[in-house]
Swiss-Prot record:
Its EC number is 3.4.21.-. The active site is at S128 (nucleophile), K180 (proton donor/acceptor). It comes from Methanocaldococcus jannaschii (strain ATCC 43067 / DSM 2661 / JAL-1 / JCM 10045 / NBRC 100440). InterPro entries: ClpP/crotonase-like_dom_sf, Pept_S49_SppA, Peptidase_S49, S49_SppA_C. Belongs to the peptidase S49 family. It comes from the Archaea. One of its GO terms (biological process) is proteolysis. This is Putative protease MJ0651. Keywords: Hydrolase, Protease, Serine protease. It is an enzyme of class 3 (hydrolase). GO terms for molecular function: serine-type peptidase activity.
Amino acid sequence: MKKIYIILLILFVILISLIGASILLVMSLSGENVDLFGGEKIAKVYLCNEIYFDYNQGDGIFPQQKKDARYYINLLDDLEKDDSVKGVLLVVNSPGGEVIASEKLARKVEELAKKKPVVVYVEGLDASGAYMVSAPADYIVAEKHSIVGSIGVRMDLMHYYGLMKKLGINVTTIKAGKYKDIGSPFRPMTKEEKEYLQKMINETYMDFVKWVAEHRHLSINYTLKIADGKIYSGEDAKKVGLVDEVGTEEDALKKLEQLANVSNPEIVEYGLEENKGLFGLTYYLGYGIGKGIGEVLYGMEKINGRVELLS
């Protein structure tokens, strides 16, 4: 009987060890560093993709959680609550993304910055919605030849009624509600419809301008002058007040350690790997702000009728 108890105890220990190893393996495959001990830490978070909400997390044979805005919001929330994390270095290389996703992530950064220091390091591209996310940080460091700004709003609506006419294709739309088919690709847009959409774009743009002005301590009038959709090099962004310093990642880390009052902290990285599933191929539809240079730099294809916080 005693031998049976010993065998059961050994099996129990082996089972617990296997469960622990499995948890560590899953966390490792998800692209996160695993910290088993306490101590002062700096979290390095890589924001290196488009900012959007992905409601299809299961594509691919071995699906993993995608690095959408919800992932970053939840991650920053965890880092905010973790007392061992003394500051956050946000490494940005993003063209922006959807309006709501960018706004919610930006508000999360704003909330985090009230609790512990946040420094942004612009590695290559910090445009439009991504800059909205960066603005509430305590300090922004950009590489000299990085691209910053592209603060503006843009909506693209594709029309192919001309092609349909040539092909002899007709579409009959039955609707209830005057604006129900606004932006339809099957007919020309009316002047009234265009004015309506322009008003919506203008309102979104002013919200963006006010956000930048507030968090970069600039006047509204001045921000309007520099927020005309123009892109700036890191050096020029420093001159107009969109970043605080032209420098390297080491400079950004040094500044964060200074703000957090820590020395030689452990650096824990998050969000570095891109997880799109084995056969993931996603076109993102929705509501966002401005397109432009980010599409060229990122090689991203977009589809009709989306307003974006993209460069």
